[in-house]
Amino acid sequence: SMSTCEVGSGFKQAVKNDVRVTKIGKFIRSTSIDELPQLFNVLVGEMSMVGARPHPIALDDKFSKLIQNYMSRYKEKPGITGLAQINNCRGETDTLEKMENRIKYDIEYSDNVSIYLYFKILFLTPIVIIFNKNVY
């Protein structure tokens, strides 16, 4: 969905109107089709359908120092979708406040995981994908 960046440039989060996103990439990212390969990770047991979305190591390193209990979001397996995503915490996390909000939902899910909440999130995810334009 994106063109490659320079070797050694490190992690760079996608942003609105990111020049690295290809034309076809814009479509597959806006419809979340680019998440489908993660189903393989679910099938082999490395991920769940629902859980905290995994972050790049660079973000984990950065925000684990800035946000109390950040790593407790990983008490459950990471997921393709989660409580944060159905509460419009998708897309760029360019401020500490946005990341704190996302982490709040991740921890809320891991502290209250239930079959009801799991299926509620699965049910609401496609609805949010259709109506939320905060993805690029």
Where are the model-predicted features located?
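Conserved small/aromatic sequence motifs within transmembrane helices
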Residues: 1-136
